[in-house]
């Protein structure tokens, strides 16, 4: 099956079931910087969940905590009720796969070989079996190749199985990353900006592909900045701001939340993460401006021991100018009278 023949429409929704992923109190600090703070998020089976937020909100850092690339400073990540280990290959083996914000393919390997790499956690043959080319290894190799070809059919890349990955168009490289992730037979697929850099046609194809993945019973958690794409695709959306979950709910709820709009436009709002610090900065700036204005006024005032009728420097300038102008004006008037 290719994405051109997928009949799933954007109105199709999954039937959310039991929790697949549960992040509890996940916090990630880098020295004195808290990139992710006390995040709670659940993804259910048969569900597509979107994670949005401004640049630097901590979305990819949160993904890295989920997949074992980072060890959270605090909190736990559970998959199907079991706490995940802090090693990425064990997370993949447990049933979580991901793609990356920047494409990470093996550029000099073929399309088929890239997908076969994703099968390594699902084969049990060891080093000696591979070196000696034992019958069990050959059977596993054939099974992996058959499954890889099924995934290439599914993503519409079967006709390019022998092409080098670097020679694929950008949109097809994104599809290949998804096919490689699916090769590990995940129960949860994490997509980090899957439509970044795509044109509208490629974006629509990616949307159809994700719906088809969901229809196969795979839960999806997706980061994306294309709001039209995310609100059309997801059953539920969470907005992350400065490392904290600001709001979570249906696409319509999140889309209509003024706090989400304010977070994207950079307008502080009451109760926002970092709003208190922003208010302190604004107050300090206002105080500094007031002090500067007061200092300027003090500089224009005459000294305390100066005669009361002594004009200040600025007054003298004004008087001089006025006097000159007045004299000129008077002289001119007298000339006119004469």
Model-derived features: positions:
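Glycine-rich phosphate-binding loops of nucleotide-dependent enzymes
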Residues: 2-285, 289
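ABC ATPase nucleotide-binding domains
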Residues: 267-338
């Amino acid at each position: 099956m290719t994405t051109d023949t997928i009949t799933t429409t954007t109105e199709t929704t999954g039937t959310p079931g039991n929790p697949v992923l549960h992040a509890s109190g996940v916090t990630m600090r880098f020295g004195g910087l808290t990139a992710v703070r006390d995040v709670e998020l659940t993804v259910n089976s048969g569900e597509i969940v979107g994670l949005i937020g401004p640049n630097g909100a901590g979305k990819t850092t949160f993904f890295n905590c989920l997949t074992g690339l980072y060890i959270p400073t605090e909190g736990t990540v559970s998959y199907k009720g079991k706490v995940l280990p802090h090693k990425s290959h064990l997370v993949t083996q447990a049933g979580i796969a991901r793609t990356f914000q920047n494409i990470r393919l093996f550029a000099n390997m073929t399309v088929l070989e890239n997908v076969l790499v994703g099968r390594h956690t699902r084969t049990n043959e060891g080093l000696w079996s591979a070196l000696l080319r034992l019958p069990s290894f050959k059977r596993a190799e054939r099974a992996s190749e058959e499954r890889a070809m099924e995934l290439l059919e599914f993503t519409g890349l079967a006709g390019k199985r022998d092409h080098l990955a670097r020679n694929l168009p950008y949109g097809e490289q994104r599809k290949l990353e998804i096919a490689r992730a699916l090769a590990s037979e995940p129960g949860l697929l994490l997509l980090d900006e899957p439509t970044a850099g795509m044109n509208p046609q490629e974006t629509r194809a990616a949307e159809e592909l994700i719906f088809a993945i969901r229809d196969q019973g795979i839960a999806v958690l997706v980061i994306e900045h294309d709001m039209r794409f995310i609100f059309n695709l997801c059953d539920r959306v969470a907005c992350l701001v400065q490392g904290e979950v600001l709001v979570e709910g249906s696409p319509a709820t999140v889309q209509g939340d003024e706090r989400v709009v304010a977070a994207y436009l950079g307008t502080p709002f009451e109760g926002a993460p970092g709003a208190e610090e922003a208010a302190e900065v604004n107050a300090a700036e206002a105080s500094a401006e007031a002090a500067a204005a007061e200092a300027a006024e003090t500089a224009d005032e005459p000294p305390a021991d100066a005669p009361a009728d002594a004009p200040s420097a600025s007054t003298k300038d004004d008087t001089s100018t006025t006097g000159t102008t007045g004299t000129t004006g008077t002289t001119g008037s007298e000339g006119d009278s004469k």
